[in-house]
């Protein structure tokens, strides 16, 4: 971190060079690090907070922690942005589009502050870990009151208190990751599905990815804390948990015990939770023991998100992905052969620097072979500070858009085809709530969205649903 004096205090700014470092220092497991001082427990009394979350499931779960911390300080949540006394943007740094959305929303906050100047505005999450972003906020968005990073969530009470006392911008961003904190509170968004962090950070350093810089080095939680958390969720009536990490397949490799992701999956399955999911997976670390664990346990869902990124060996090497097209397809076939009815989805980037038409056709070839149930597709977005951002971006915007269109056309074809196999079949669906059109909605074990006709009494239950119609990205059905 870099100290910066603003005249009356010291700001802790992010430093990309520091964020690249990976120390050999042991990560400590701390069970009493988070605390709200007595004099801060009523700091938010009579005040409302609003959180807007961008990005991945890890960010969603971070926001659940932030909400609980704020409520420990007597703030109450509001869904109405204009009514809030505290507005926090929990940001994503993975693509430029996410940046633009955040700065666009900040414009709305600035306008609101003109009529309600007492409002506190904060930026947190992965964008707060980016040196260039924080410098821009410091120089051009002086009305943003607080900025804190992914490693500073536990210190929100003190950051807020300083800002409210000093009436000036407070920035606290640690570039080097902290220890694993086991006593952060959580206010879960759902009563039926829960996110459970099993690890933090990533050491893969794919050349296009900013996450290893914004989330720090890999740190696994100890198994006992994860299992105890899931047991408590079972006691509280939860039906489904998702084990979260930037690369869950690498879980345990930093622990000084012989305990890996396959072991964790088996132990979590023993808790009796109805449904277990995990994300995100890196093909490099997806071993046979993980596949066996999924196959052996009915409550581990037959759904795997397996990012491809590119089907070209040349581009995969430039991306630093550590596998070849052949190795990826070998893993894909193992999953299909060993896990009945498995649904596999993926991520694909088009227009990476150096991608030729031949490279792109290699990607289409893999999509044609794998026939994914779904795919998240993106045009390459250079992130400041990553090796790929310095590569010669020799693919024209026209070529990028043409390739994305062609890829999406193929992805849509296979998504629709994958859904066809559900028509007139009965499948189990966890009903999660009421959709925009007034019908119930939920997900199959294979992560298919289903719009369901039925009574609200079924919310929170796993029910049998007959699929009556299929669309490209969803299914329609009725409870039987």
Give short role names for the model-derived ranges:
Residues 299-302, 314-430, 440, 461:
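A structural motif corresponding to the C-terminal lobe/cap of the Radical SAM core domain
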Residues 138-153, 262-273, 296-301, 362-374:
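Structural recognition of alpha->loop->beta junctions
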Residues 206, 226, 243, 278, ...:
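Conserved, mostly hydrophobic/aromatic
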């Amino acid at each position: 971190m870099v100290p910066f004096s603003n005249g009356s205090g010291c700001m802790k700014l992010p430093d990309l060079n520091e964020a690249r470092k990976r120390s050999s220092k042991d990560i400590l497991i701390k069970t009493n690090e988070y605390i709200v001082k007595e004099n801060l427990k009523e700091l938010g009394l009579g005040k409302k907070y609003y959180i807007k979350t961008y990005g991945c499931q890890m960010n969603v779960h971070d926001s659940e922690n932030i909400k609980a911390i704020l409520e420990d300080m007597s703030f109450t949540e509001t869904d109405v942005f204009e009514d809030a006394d505290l507005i926090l943007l929990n940001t994503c740094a993975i693509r430029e589009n996410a940046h633009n959305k955040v700065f666009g929303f900040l414009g709305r906050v600035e306008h609101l502050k003109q009529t309600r100047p007492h409002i506190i505005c904060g930026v947190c999450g992965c964008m707060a870990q980016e040196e260039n972003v924080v410098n821009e906020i410091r120089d051009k968005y002086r009305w943003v009151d607080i900025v804190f990073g992914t490693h500073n969530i536990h210190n929100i009470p003190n950051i807020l208190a300083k800002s409210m006392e000093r009436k000036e911008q407070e920035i606290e961003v640690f570039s080097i990751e902290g220890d694993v904190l086991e006593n952060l509170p959580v206010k879960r968004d759902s009563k039926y599905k829960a996110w459970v962090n099993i690890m933090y950070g990533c050491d893969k350093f794919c050349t296009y990815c900013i996450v290893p810089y914004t989330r720090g080095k890999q740190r696994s939680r100890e198994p006992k804390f994860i299992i105890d958390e899931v047991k408590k969720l079972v006691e509280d009536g939860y039906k489904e948990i998702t084990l979260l990490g930037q690369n869950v397949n690498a879980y345990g490799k930093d622990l000084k015990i012989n305990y890996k992701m396959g072991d964790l999956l088996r132990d979590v399955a023993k808790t009796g939770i109805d449904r277990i999911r995990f994300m995100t997976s890196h093909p490099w670390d997806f071993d046979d023991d993980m596949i066996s664990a999924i196959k052996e346990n009915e409550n581990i869902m037959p759904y795997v998100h397996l990012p491809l990124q590119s089907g070209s060996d040349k581009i995969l090497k430039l991306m630093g992905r550590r596998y070849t097209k052949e190795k990826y397809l070998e893993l894909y076939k193992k999953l299909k052969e060993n896990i009945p009815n498995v649904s596999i989805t993926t991520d694909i980037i088009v227009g990476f620097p150096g991608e030729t038409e031949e490279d792109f056709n290699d990607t289409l070839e893999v999509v044609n072979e794998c026939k994914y149930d779904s795919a998240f597709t993106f045009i390459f977005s250079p992130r400041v500070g990553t090796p790929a951002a310095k590569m010669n971006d020799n693919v024209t915007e026209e070529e990028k858009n043409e390739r994305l269109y062609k890829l999406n056309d193929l992805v849509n074809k296979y998504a629709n085809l994958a859904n066809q196999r559900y028509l007139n079949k009965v499948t189990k669906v966890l009903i999660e709530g009421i959709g925009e059109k007034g019908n119930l909605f939920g997900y199959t074990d294979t992560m298919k969205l289903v719009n369901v006709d039925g009574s609200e009494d079924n919310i929170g239950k796993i029910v049998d649903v007959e699929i009556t119609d299929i669309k490209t990205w969803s299914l329609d059905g009725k409870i039987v």
